[in-house]
């Protein structure tokens, strides 16, 4: 089983969006073999790489800061939804807690939303995402809408 040989199923959205060639550096020992307790004097290159990525992401998004962990999967969903919840709390709109999720979403989507105290509103996507139904759902909850989670 491999990304370049067969379909990767549930829980691998991030992997599906990256070509195999872009993942090659992830197999290089120079990238993957740093020991977690390596002395600071031996990790300057890693720190420079990660800190410049953080600065780049902050400049692109307009956020005050960013986190490179967690990177994907249910932990990434949860982290993203926590950011959304905290944002609305910070601007005095803590009542914005509705998350629209397609019925076909994998179970981590509603689980992550529920763990963030979000109220889930389902959208039927058995015929694909109906734009008019989506607009109507957004309009019906416009004062409390916080997020939309769409996976494939």
Question: Which ranges hold each PLM region?
Answer:
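Flexible inter-domain linker/hinge segments
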Residues: 1-9, 14-21, 26-32
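Active-site nucleophile and cofactor-binding loops and adjacent substrate-binding regions
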Residues: 10, 67-75, 101-105
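Gly-rich Lys/Arg/Thr-decorated short loops/hinges at beta-loop-alpha junctions or inter-strand turns
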Residues: 27-41, 58-59, 114-122, 142-150
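Conserved N-terminal alpha-helix of the aminotransferase class I/II PLP-enzyme fold
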Residues: 31-71, 76
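Conserved PLP-anchoring active-site segment centered on the Schiff-base-forming lysine
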Residues: 87-107
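Short beta->alpha connector loops at strand-helix junctions that form conserved
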Residues: 103, 122-126
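Active-site phosphate-binding strand-loop segment of PLP-dependent enzymes
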Residues: 129-152
